[in-house]
Amino acid sequence: MGNKNVIQKMREKTPLIHCITNYVTINDCANILLAFGASPAMCEAYDEAYDFVSISSALYINLGTLTKEQETAAILASISAKNHNVPVVIDPVGCPAIKRKVEVINRIAEVGRIDIIKGNIGEIKFLAGMDSETRGVDSLDNGENALDACTQLAKKYNCIVAATGKKDFVSDGKRGSVIKNGTEMLTKVTGAGCMLGALCAATCASFEDKLVSTTAAILSMNIAGEKAYEKAQLPGSFRIALIDNIYMISDEEIWERGNVEWK
């Protein structure tokens, strides 16, 4: 996959990440972006979103607690992203349970742009039109055919698609990766997926190959999680240790420790 100094390039740029995200994990997303080396801006007012995207390095839209104002802001921001060539990451949190969120994704694809869709396996399979098991915002899916779902959805939206679970899957419609790092403790703290979406926005803001940048973001989260669990086996202390280890993560570490199968 060639030169893979994804984290180094991101930290050299210190990309400004415009986040329109949910109220549950907004603080976690801001803190993990800072620890990673990016600059977060949690700007969701619909009358500010268009202008702010024009000075941003990437736009992260998380649909977790989608209000009407956030919906309007997300659509306007995506239009600005298209006009100003700013990459967009979408996290379709809870889309199998709330069909309105699919309408919002399709509207963003129609009038704006989507570069990466990052969701759990249940959400991605649902968006791809495949049978999936979910409960609220959580996936109960066993991961069967997950890479196929990513590939189908990547072709539909002409973007990168990442599906997270016990294994993580990434596809650009032609190439793919399967990531086998991680720890179950990441499922015991609220917002691990939301934080990962923010990291995907940070890496894609400064690295051209978005399949590689997305894979690097997932490896960063998973390996930081593994290292955090070595020191902290309880959810509260683990959450703090996770951010500490994101602060210390490096390209050398993720590619040496990473268990990745390129497809």
UniProtKB/Swiss-Prot annotation:
CDD domains the UniProt entry points to: THZ_kinase
EC numbers, comma separated: 2.7.1.50
Record field: catalytic activity: 5-(2-hydroxyethyl)-4-methylthiazole + ATP = 4-methyl-5-(2-phosphooxyethyl)-thiazole + ADP + H(+)
One term of GO molecular function: ATP binding
Binding site for substrate: 42, 191
GO-annotated biological processes: thiamine biosynthetic process; thiamine diphosphate biosynthetic process
Family: Belongs to the Thz kinase family.
Cofactor annotation: Mg(2+)
Lineage: Bacteria, Bacillati, Bacillota, Clostridia, Eubacteriales
Enzyme class: transferase
Pathway where this protein functions: Cofactor biosynthesis; thiamine diphosphate biosynthesis; 4-methyl-5-(2-phosphoethyl)-thiazole from 5-(2-hydroxyethyl)-4-methylthiazole: step 1/1
Matching HAMAP family: Thz_kinase (MF_00228)
UniProt keyword annotation of Magnesium present: yes
InterPro entries: Hyethyz_kinase, Ribokinase-like
Name of the protein in its database record: Hydroxyethylthiazole kinase 2
Pfam families from the UniProt entry: HK
Source species of the chain: Clostridium botulinum (strain Loch Maree / Type A3)
